[in-house]
């Protein structure tokens, strides 16, 4: 066995937490009343939530680079609190930005030093982690310009931050759809399975772009797929087995969607934008109608050309804009003026 594929002690510890804590999380699904109450709560507590985060994750955290930047700007907690009370959250962030309290992508990744006048330091990825969160699992950023960064996910707080998937499906009348995923193995798949399950959505198929039997696949990812299904069984939820489906030949997905449509139901595939396009191209090549099918496109921009192929196949698509660091930032608009228009999640984000 290749040494790089041997699970580490951290992997084994995460596996134990995974199997003991995830079933408990999955057993209690959202209700409509609960979701809308959580949304009202978070919209009404934006400033309070921000100040709580600033106090515990920044000012009480000696490793936080934002604490260093705030010190450089001459801001203590009470001043930030006063700014928020007087000017509101967005204007406070603009004021802090003008004072140099921000990180560029290059600075946050540690590729360039943070330089503000006489202040000069490097940021390590772990310096940006919230010390109050336990890393039950970790997701890795896309790493489009280098190796991705690990971002911890805490099951204890996961549920309170997962109701957005319910709202998206509810808005699209999609809670009763037959849902499927076509993604690469890893923690991002796991988090999406959890979000959909908490919404009470049925996951009918699990298509994977990487062969689970491949010798090149790290054991961590192979076992994570098994642990997810085992945790589901412990919670009374039966997750489907992963089905290896090559990018160039997604005919199995097309046939599944066709069978659901023939049964008078709605199939919904959650996948990367280029993969959705390939599914629609395959359907067109085989003369199979996807009228009534739904897609959620992630990971890549939804261009006019991509949307045109989806529409030509008879399907409809929405987008989901997210990052590993921030989770969901925006969901697709139901009446967009542009193909990639999203509704910004102001309950959890601010610009």
Predicted regions and their residues:
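Glycine-rich, aromatic-lined ligand/substrate-binding cores of catalytic
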Residues: 349
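Active-site phosphate/ATP/adenylate-binding loop shared across adenylate-forming ligases
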Residues: 7-29, 34, 38-318, 325-341, ...
């Amino acid at each position: 066995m290749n040494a790089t594929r041997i699970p580490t002690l951290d992997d084994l510890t995460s596996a134990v937490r995974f199997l003991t804590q995830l079933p408990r999380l999955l057993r209690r699904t959202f209700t409509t009343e609960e979701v809308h109450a959580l949304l009202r709560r978070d919209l009404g507590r934006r400033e309070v939530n921000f100040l709580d985060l600033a106090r515990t994750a920044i000012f009480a955290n000696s490793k936080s680079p934002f604490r260093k930047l705030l010190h450089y700007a001459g801001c203590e907690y009470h001043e930030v609190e006063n700014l928020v009370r007087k000017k509101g959250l967005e204007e406070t962030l603009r004021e802090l930005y003008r004072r140099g309290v921000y990180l560029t992508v290059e600075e946050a990744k540690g590729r360039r030093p943070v330089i503000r006048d006489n202040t000069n330091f490097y940021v390590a990825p772990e310096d940006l982690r919230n010390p109050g969160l336990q890393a039950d699992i970790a997701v890795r950023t896309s790493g489009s310009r280098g190796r991705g960064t690990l971002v911890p996910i805490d099951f204890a707080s996961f549920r309170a931050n997962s109701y957005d998937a319910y709202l998206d499906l509810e808005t699209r009348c999609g809670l009763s759809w037959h849902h499927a995923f076509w993604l690469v193995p890893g923690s991002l798949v796991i988090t999406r399975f959890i979000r959909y399950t908490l919404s009470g959505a049925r996951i009918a198929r699990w298509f994977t772009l990487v062969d689970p039997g491949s010798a090149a696949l790290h054991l961590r990812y192979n076992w994570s797929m098994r642990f997810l299904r085992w945790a589901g069984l412990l919670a009374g939820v039966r997750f489907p087995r992963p089905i290896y489906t090559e990018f160039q030949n997604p005919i199995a997905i097309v046939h599944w969607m066709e069978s659901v449509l023939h049964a008078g139901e709605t199939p919904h595939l959650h996948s990367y934008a280029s993969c959705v396009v390939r599914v629609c191209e395959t359907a067109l090549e085989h003369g199979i109608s996807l009228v009534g099918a739904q897609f959620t496109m992630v990971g890549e921009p939804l261009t006019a050309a991509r949307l045109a192929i989806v529409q030509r196949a008879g399907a409809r698509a929405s987008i989901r804009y997210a990052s590993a660091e921030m989770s969901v930032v925006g969901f697709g608009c139901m009446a967009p003026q542009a193909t990639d228009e999203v509704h910004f999640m102001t309950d959890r984000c601010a610009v």
